């Protein structure tokens, strides 16, 4: 029979619920048969309920477990009261003696097996197994098969040698402490050995069992929340020696201060400890058992019995834990109080499996303080074989000695990780062995080792020692406290569950698993480490993500056909934290532009129409007024940039007629102003067949032609005016274009490509890539008073910043950026900055108040301050606003008016900046107050208004959004655009955003 039962311990963990019931019966051998029968009738319902509970939860689904678990404890409260009283009255029954012979046999077998294991363990230790496999192996060795016996025996420490002889005589009540300890030993043995028989137990005993399991859960509860813990500790403290009392007070103080939120983290690390060194727990629960038993106090005994059977139950999960040493602490996150009931147990193990490296670290740390303590104890503690009284004294001394040490050790950060690992291995090797027979113990290590199970054990043992009458009240009090606790437990569980939504069973403890609260001095310190480590791990994780994103962008930029994926949630922040090289930024933006081009080949008009629909309300209400407010200097009547000039009006002016029609034109190539007279159909430079007229600018007119030498490739030919100044300007533009093209051989920077140049009839002709429209025409055609879609504006802004980047690399100022000088391709996806007729080298910046078209003129130009690349940035800002709204941002009639409009947006110009202006006196008085020059509407005379302060009154965001009802993603982008414009339109060029910063701005980086 004994032989048959040994494997059953190993193979049938699911029997353990029933087994634990049985063990309580055996433990309560003292209960007389007739008493148990009397109670049987009284508790019949309860008994069956309890039994069915265990059956149900053997294989029930997790949802059922959850549901039942919530309500179970409420109904058990009253039962517990009755049960506790009943158990007090019960005596010991000799009913189980018949089984003891078998037990003795089984014990011998177990001892032999344990000896073999000890040798194995020693070999492992000596081989200094430090690998993860070694740890796992050791976990297996001290696994579920041994756990019952090993842990029970270890629980009953030094008396294991006398076990077999004493088992039979142990059932009588004896007042001396040693005999009660022995009795508990034999009881625990019986329990573990006869697990498989336990279902057959009789009714009265089953009732006791129920009580036991209940009170066990109570006890477990006791160990759950720090505040409650401190209560029971206070009581224990009463009976402790003064030094012990002091020490435990320190501990309790530490544990109490964080109270419930820390309890959660403590429980986490405790549960981790439990997982990793089951040995430690066992010793802890052992202490708990001993502590609660006094010869005088049957009540204490019954409570203990209960706690023991629970511990037995806890063994299965612990064994599982040992086998899976790397388990996620996350499940232990919520307060240990969470799932005490058996229903929780099955849900635990799967969770345990998923330990991230970070978490493994954490658990390592939390484990190590205990292990260290054990080691230090080993060296210091007196031999275990002292009499109980003496042992108590030496323990208290030891504890005194150990306290500072534990505190020192408990800062897990200070311990190197490999140290911890080796210690953990050592403790694993040692602890299973140390719990076995004295012989083996001697072989493996000095008896001293047995002493040092865990800090918990240390702090608990005094409690065990105090068997005074006070103990009895304490038992009573703690029982009622437990009942109270169980009431509040449900609420707390609910709370903690809501906190930790990801994992229902996070932090749950299998029934019988105790939260190791007494190591709170270690754990409190650890709380913070755990959080910090989480932070570090998060930072590390983000860094890895950023690198992945950057890699993606690199590959994409290399492959011009591919485009950037939309993963990076906030590339802006990631790039900034990495401080990426400008090249990275540029490549990323270039890739983004290509993606936009590919995705939006045919969607430009659709997106503009969508925006029109959003703006319908605004247009209906007040578009006519707005036209008056912002006079359009590019009205149809005098627009020299209208799409095709071979219209009736132009034909009447003699432009665009075929020269064959009028032979007199043959010698008269140039008109009075020096413009070339274009003839559709003529061939320029013997290869460019002119088929259309594009327009006329200050410096030139532009025709469309096909290159006969290049398979009729379309080109745009710019024919410079034939006068000395214009030729000079044309040659300067040619020089800048060549420089820019040479600096951008791959055409990534969106400056117009120059193919070649030639002279035709004394006019300098520049041959460019063909582009269909400029942005002024696009706005007129698609977005009049409405503007373009935010997607288009974002892409255009990316491309404009790239163009500015190239200009800066070449030390060139464009000095005339505006929608008219930005050309787009047929699909309106790619733009090119053109018309470098006003461009200059950055060093040659002559101070002139009329540089740049007025609406796009930066304030530093107007006041005559020196300028640099910031003037082009300002122009781009004005252009972007215009592209999104369809309205000119600063439609000033004069330079003075331009300053007023700019200050209406940004506030008064800084005095420091005003003082540097050559033309400051035209706009500011001696006190640097702004002199606003306006024409009186009545008298039509100029009047000057002195403004000492100008408060910003223009709301850029309101102007951008207007009356649009934007979806959330677009609204976000508009807010980002507003932020970008605020930084671009700084009055002081020194504070204006740089090109690199603009390229890293969220508006540019984040996709829609």
UniProtKB/Swiss-Prot annotation:
All copies of domain Protein kinase, residue ranges: 688-1004
Phosphotyrosine PTM positions: 140, 850
Gene name in the database record: PRP4K
Descriptive protein name: Serine/threonine-protein kinase PRP4 homolog
Species of the source: Bos taurus (Bovine)
Catalytic activity: L-seryl-[protein] + ATP = O-phospho-L-seryl-[protein] + ADP + H(+); L-threonyl-[protein] + ATP = O-phospho-L-threonyl-[protein] + ADP + H(+)
One cellular component (GO) term of this entry: spliceosomal complex
Family: Belongs to the protein kinase superfamily. CMGC Ser/Thr protein kinase family.
Cross-link position per record: Glycyl lysine isopeptide (Lys-Gly) (interchain with G-Cter in SUMO2): 99, 111, 117, 170, 177, 594, 660
Residues recorded as bearing Phosphothreonine in the entry: 385
Bias (Basic residues) ranges: 39-59, 67-81, 179-202, 214-230, 302-315, 342-367, 438-498
Biased amino acid composition, Low complexity: 157-168, 563-582
Chain residue ranges for the region called Disordered: 1-103, 140-536, 560-584
């Amino acid at each position: 029979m004994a032989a048959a039962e040994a494997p059953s311990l190993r193979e049938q963990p699911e029997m353990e619920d029933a087994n634990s019931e049985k063990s309580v019966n055996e433990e309560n051998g003292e209960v007389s048969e007739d008493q148990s029968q009397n109670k049987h009738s009284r508790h019949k319902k309860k008994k069956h309920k309890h039994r069915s509970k265990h059956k149900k939860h053997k294989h029930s689904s997790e949802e059922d477990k959850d549901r039942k678990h919530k309500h179970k404890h409420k109904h058990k409260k009253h039962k517990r009261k009755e049960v506790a009283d009943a158990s007090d009255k019960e005596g010991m029954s000799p009913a189980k003696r018949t089984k003891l012979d078998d037990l003795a046999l089984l014990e011998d077998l177990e001892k032999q097996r344990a000896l073999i294991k000890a040798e194995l363990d020693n070999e492992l230790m000596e081989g200094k197994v430090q690998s993860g496999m070694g740890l796992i192996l050791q976990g297996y060795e001290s696994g579920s098969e041994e756990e019952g016996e090993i842990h029970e025996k270890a629980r009953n420490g030094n008396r294991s040698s006398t076990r077999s002889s004493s088992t039979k005589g142990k059932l009588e009540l004896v007042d001396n402490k040693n005999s009660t300890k022995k009795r508990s030993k034999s009881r625990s043995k019986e329990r573990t050995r006869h697990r498989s028989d336990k279902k057959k137990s009789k009714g009265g005993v089953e009732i006791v069992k129920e009580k036991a399991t209940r009170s066990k859960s109570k006890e477990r509860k006791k160990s759950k929340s720090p505040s409650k813990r401190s209560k029971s500790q206070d009581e224990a403290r009463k009976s402790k020696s003064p030094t012990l009392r002091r020490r435990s007070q320190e501990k309790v103080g530490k544990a109490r201060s964080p109270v419930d939120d820390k309890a959660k983290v403590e429980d986490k690390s405790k549960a981790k400890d439990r997982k990793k060194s089951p040995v430690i727990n066992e010793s802890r629960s052992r202490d708990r058992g001993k502590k609660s038993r006094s010869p005088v106090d049957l009540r204490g005994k019954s409570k203990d019995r209960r706690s023991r059977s629970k511990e037995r139950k806890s063994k299965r999960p612990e064994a599982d834990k040992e086998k899976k040493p790397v388990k996620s602490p996350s499940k232990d996150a919520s307060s240990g109080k969470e799932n005490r009931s058996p229903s929780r147990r099955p849900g635990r193990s799967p969770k345990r499996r998923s330990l991230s490296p970070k978490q493994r670290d954490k658990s390592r740390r939390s484990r190590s303080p205990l292990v260290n303590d054990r080691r230090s104890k080993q060296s210091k503690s007196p031999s275990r074989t002292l009499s109980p009284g003496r042992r108590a004294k030496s323990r208290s001394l030891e504890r005194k000695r150990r306290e500072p040490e534990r505190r020192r050790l408990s800062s897990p950060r200070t311990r190197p990780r490999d140290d911890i690992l080796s210690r953990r291995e050592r403790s694993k090797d040692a602890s299973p062995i140390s719990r076995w027979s004295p012989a083996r113990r001697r072989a493996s290590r000095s008896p001293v080792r047995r002493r040092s199970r865990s800090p918990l054990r240390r702090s608990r043992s005094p409690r065990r020692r105090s068997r005074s009458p006070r103990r009895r009240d304490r038992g009573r009090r703690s029982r009622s406290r437990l009942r109270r606790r169980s009431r509040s437990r449900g609420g707390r569980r609910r709370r903690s569950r809501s906190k930790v939504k990801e994992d229902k069973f996070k932090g749950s403890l299998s029934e019988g698993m105790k939260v190791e609260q007494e190591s709170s001095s270690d754990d409190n310190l650890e709380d913070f480490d755990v959080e910090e480590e989480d932070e570090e791990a998060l930072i590390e994780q983000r860094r890895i993500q950023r690198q992945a994103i950057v890699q993606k962008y690199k590959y994409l930029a290399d492959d011009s056909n591919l485009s950037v994926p939309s993963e990076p949630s906030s590339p802006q922040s990631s790039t900034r934290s990495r401080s990426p090289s400008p090249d990275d930024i540029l490549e990323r933006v270039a890739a983004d532009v290509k993606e936009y081009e590919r995705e939006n080949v045919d969607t430009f008009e659709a997106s503009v129409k969508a925006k029109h629909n959003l703006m319908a309300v605004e247009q209906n209400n007040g578009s006519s007024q707005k036209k008056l407010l912002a006079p359009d200097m590019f009205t149809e009547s005098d627009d020299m940039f209208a799409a095709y000039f071979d219209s009736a009006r132009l034909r009447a002016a003699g432009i665009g007629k075929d020269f064959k029609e009028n032979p007199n034109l043959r010698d008269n190539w140039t008109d009075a102003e020096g413009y070339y007279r274009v003839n559709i159909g003529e061939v320029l430079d013997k290869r460019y067949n002119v088929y259309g007229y594009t327009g006329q600018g200050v410096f030139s007119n532009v025709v469309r032609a096909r290159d006969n030498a290049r398979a009729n490739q379309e080109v745009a030919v710019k024919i410079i005016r034939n006068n000395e100044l214009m030729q000079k300007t044309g040659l300067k533009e040619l020089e800048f274009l060549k420089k820019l093209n040479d600096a951008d051989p791959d055409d990534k920077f969106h400056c117009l490509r120059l193919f070649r140049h030639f002279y035709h009839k004394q006019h300098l002709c520049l041959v460019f890539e063909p582009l269909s429209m400029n942005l002024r025409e696009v706005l007129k055609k698609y977005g009049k008073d409405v503007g373009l879609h935010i997607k288009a504006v974002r892409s255009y802004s990316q491309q404009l910043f790239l163009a500015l980047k190239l200009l800066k690399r070449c030390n060139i100022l464009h000095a005339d950026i505006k929608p008219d000088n930005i050309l787009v391709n047929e699909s309106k996806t790619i733009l090119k900055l053109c018309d470098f007729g006003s461009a200059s080298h950055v060093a040659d910046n002559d101070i002139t108040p009329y540089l740049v078209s007025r609406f796009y003129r930066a304030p530093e130009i107007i006041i005559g301050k020196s300028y640099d690349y910031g003037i082009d940035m300002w122009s781009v800002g004005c252009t972007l606003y215009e592209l999104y709204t369809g309205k000119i941002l600063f439609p000033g009639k004069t330079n003075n008016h331009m300053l007023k409009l700019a200050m209406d947006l940004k506030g008064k110009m800084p005095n420091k900046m005003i003082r540097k202006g050559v033309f400051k006196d035209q706009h500011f008085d001696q006190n640097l107050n702004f002199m606003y020059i306006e024409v009186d509407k009545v008298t039509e005379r100029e009047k000057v208004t002195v403004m000492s302060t100008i408060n910003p009154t223009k709301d850029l965001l309101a102007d951008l959004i207007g009356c649009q009802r934007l979806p959330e993603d677009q609204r976000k982008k508009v807010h980002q655009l507003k932020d970008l414009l605020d930084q671009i339109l700084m009055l002081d060029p020194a504070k204006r955003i740089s090109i690199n910063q603009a390229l890293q701005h969220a508006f540019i980086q984040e996709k829609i």
